[in-house]
Amino acid sequence: MKIDVLSIFPDMFDPLRQSMIGKAIEKGLIDFKVTDFREFTTNKQRHVDDVVYGGGAGMLLMPQPIFDAMEEVKKENNGDKGHVILVDPAGRKFDHHVAKKLSTYNHLTFISGHYEGYDNRIRNLVDEEISLGDYVLTGGELASMVIIDATVRFLDNVLGNSESAADDSFQNGLLEEPQYTRPANFRGIQVPEVLTNGDHEKIRKWRLKESLRKTFLRRPDLLEKRSFNKEELDFLDDIKYEESLDSDQ
């Protein structure tokens, strides 16, 4: 996958070159480049922003540097600008499903803004607008990094274990069940016995039930978006009964 980023703070993306993503870059699984669109300004002061027409607080990113930077991206990629993403609070909310969809593109280009916002004409370059949530950051760099990190996890051979992404929270519409490692007893806190007895079917059922329980208690909204088989419905009935007993104590 080719990933281009347009930003006036390219050094902020250096952490993405570490850990698993860094290894994926080294292996050639990801071609990652950040373009400083300040380099494409035409004014002497190298300003990338200007005042808002009609008045108003703050400054807006001007279209010219970003349009010219995008032309450079196209030139470097044989006319391909990629699937262009504008990171903006007004975009659709980012989630697991969006990340998985983005991972199917061969080329992604992120426009990471700053200041008060963008000249609206910049949106003529954009294929999709994405938001991390109902809050505003000082710039789009952090949001772009989150989206990139979550997306590339779905690429083949990026994660060390091919099952890691498949087992993540949200992969099957549920939160991941509680997990444990050695020792089996730590300061009197015991790993559930079912996980140590070697019965794979019992372990599967425990994991499914505890995944449902965790989702029921912490993110019940996820259950509203999901269909269930009979086993899951039976587990949910058990969970609701067990939790009602706990709340009465």
UniProtKB/Swiss-Prot annotation:
Q: Which Pfam families match?
A: tRNA_m1G_MT
Q: Which reaction does it catalyse?
A: guanosine(37) in tRNA + S-adenosyl-L-methionine = N(1)-methylguanosine(37) in tRNA + S-adenosyl-L-homocysteine + H(+)
Subcellular localization, per the record?
Cytoplasm
What's this protein's function? Specifically methylates guanosine-37 in various tRNAs.
Q: What is its EC number?
A: 2.1.1.228
Positions that bind S-adenosyl-L-methionine: G113, L132, G133, D134, Y135, V136, L137
Q: Which GO terms describe its cellular component?
A: cytosol
Predominant location category: cytoplasm
Q: Biological process GO terms, please?
A: tRNA N1-guanine methylation
Q: Name one GO molecular function term.
A: tRNA (guanine(37)-N1)-methyltransferase activity
- Coiled-coil intervals: none
**Subunit structure of this entry?**
Homodimer.
Instruction: Supply the name of the protein.
Output: tRNA (guanine-N(1)-)-methyltransferase
Q: What's the family? A: Belongs to the RNA methyltransferase TrmD family.
Q: Which UniProt keywords apply?
A: Cytoplasm, Methyltransferase, S-adenosyl-L-methionine, Transferase, tRNA processing
This protein's source sits in the domain of life called Bacteria
